[in-house]
Amino acid sequence: QLVHTQIDLEMSFCDEEDVFAIVEGIISAAFKAVNGLEVKGPFPRLSYDEAMERFGSDKPDLRFGMEMRDLTDLVTESDFSIFREVCASGGRVRGLAAAGCAHFSRKETDELADIAKIYKAKGIITLKVEEGQVKGSVAKYLSEDAQRGIVKRLQAADGDLIIMVADDPEVSAISLGQVRRFLGRKLGLIREGDYKLLWVTEFPLFEWNPDENRWEAKHHIFTQPREQDLPILESDPAGVKGRLYDLVLNGVEMGSGSIRINKPDLQKRVMKIIGTTAEDAERKFGFLLRAYEYGGPVHGGLAIGFDRLIAVILGLENLRDVIAFP
């Protein structure tokens, strides 16, 4: 497509390490050609679970810190009803410390709450750190041990603003992650010309669709599950991780790929979990399943959005500035 350029790799007899090595070489060459920067591999790696726990995003921006922490165990027994109810229902209380932001006005904290609400959170809870103690309307409901534990876990210091979200596990992570992202820009924590690359790996293979009351493939149905998860494929789809990986640059997904299924029996198992009948599998994918009966090589790949990559390297916000026919 003239309006969109993609570098698509399809490789046989490969594993993740082979794909990573080739892509890191491509990215290093692109940086050198576009702006003369030396970017060397191997790039850092985070599992999907770790990225969500620490940054509230599957494409985290590593150009600044302000990492999130799970505070659930510290507030489970608190007298604050919201904390207690969220913990009892299996939710999570997560927090971060915004350095030097205890002076934030009500208008500024309301702005943070509005961002969290966009991502389905009911709101935020804020505490200020003064002389090693937390101050705020919720502080009186927290024991001294809980207060000290929160300050220690978040590595908060005097003058910091502690921001917490108590909600469903996914909502609390994503909404607080977006607050973190906003603060990174608002506080000027991102240096111009700074580039942070990483791989995010081991995404969930399936996600639940409550509207249709069934499992769906999080990316696509041809992704190979991790071998250690095969025993729980049918019994615990939520716990199955795929051999999936994304390349992330400065909080933007640059490319996505996976190691594919190459065995017909495994492909049929995955199809069955998402509700594909044997008849539909044959009608839609019979050619593929029959081909695998003859033996297909282990294969995988990745696709890089070339225009997006160049835009981020050049520090441009709009893809129209780098494509041939905008």
Model features per residue range: what roles?
Residues 1-326:
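Class II aminoacyl-tRNA synthetase catalytic cores and aaRS-like
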